[in-house]
């Protein structure tokens, strides 16, 4: 395996759904006023970490969080289709009644995030490619595919690269399970704070977690989960 840079896994800022009861949630919420404040603080922290590559989920809450990172660091984000939240884009909140939604399409993303790189899998209809609410097992399989892709990209990175992914709480857990080769990691870890940063690095052929859920860039009143 060629050199692989460390990987920063970042949860998006507080979304409008995070601040609402389940029954009021919408398929693709933006971020709240608190979320904007969190994003600004995150962006300042990321300027010090100086990521050279920033991948983000196609969900609006990740895109809006990433916009602040891009402004502060100058990195041009890459919107990847396959790092969305577990469950996918859907309406409804009750088990068995969730209906798949397609998410933003390529034209909308190109217009709202001009200059960003868009995954070729994001099409004219939208980015969510399943016709159902994604299961936990499907999300785990997807996380393993993301790991395989990241490791296959090793020859594309230099020793100076620092890679960040702006993603979601549940899929962050699935990625940790895939990279750390753990069956279930949820019970070992606490709540994931909005805009918290975790870092993975490769050592002697195995991935390790250098730190988890760091949110020291936030003031106490800005912390949310």
Ranges and model annotations:
Residues 25, 93-96, 123-140:
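Surface-exposed cleft-lining segments at the edges of enzyme active sites
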Residues 130-158:
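A mid-sequence, solvent-exposed acidic-amphipathic segment
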């Amino acid at each position: 395996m060629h050199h692989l840079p460390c990987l920063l896994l970042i949860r998006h800022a507080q979304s409008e759904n995070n601040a609402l009861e389940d029954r009021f949630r919408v398929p693709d919420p933006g971020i709240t006023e608190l979320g904007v404040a969190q994003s600004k603080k995150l962006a300042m922290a990321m300027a010090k970490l100086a990521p050279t590559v920033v991948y983000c989920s196609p969900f609006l809450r990740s895109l809006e969080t990433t916009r602040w990172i891009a402004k502060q660091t100058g990195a041009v984000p890459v919107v990847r289709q396959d790092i969305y939240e577990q469950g996918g884009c859907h309406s409804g909140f009750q088990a068995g009644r969730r209906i798949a939604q397609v998410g933003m399409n390529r034209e909308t993303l190109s217009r709202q995030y001009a200059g960003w790189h868009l995954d070729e899998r994001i099409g004219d209809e939208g980015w969510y490619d399943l016709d159902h609410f994604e299961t936990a097992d499907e999300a785990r399989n997807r996380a393993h595919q993301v790991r395989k892709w990241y490791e296959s990209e090793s020859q594309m990175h230099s020793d100076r690269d620092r890679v960040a992914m702006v993603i979601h709480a549940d899929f962050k857990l699935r990625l940790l399970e895939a990279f750390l080769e753990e069956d279930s990691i949820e019970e070992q870890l606490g709540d994931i704070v909005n805009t918290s940063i975790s870092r993975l690095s490769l050592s002697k052929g195995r991935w390790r977690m250098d730190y988890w859920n760091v949110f020291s860039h936030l003031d106490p009143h800005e912390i949310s989960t």
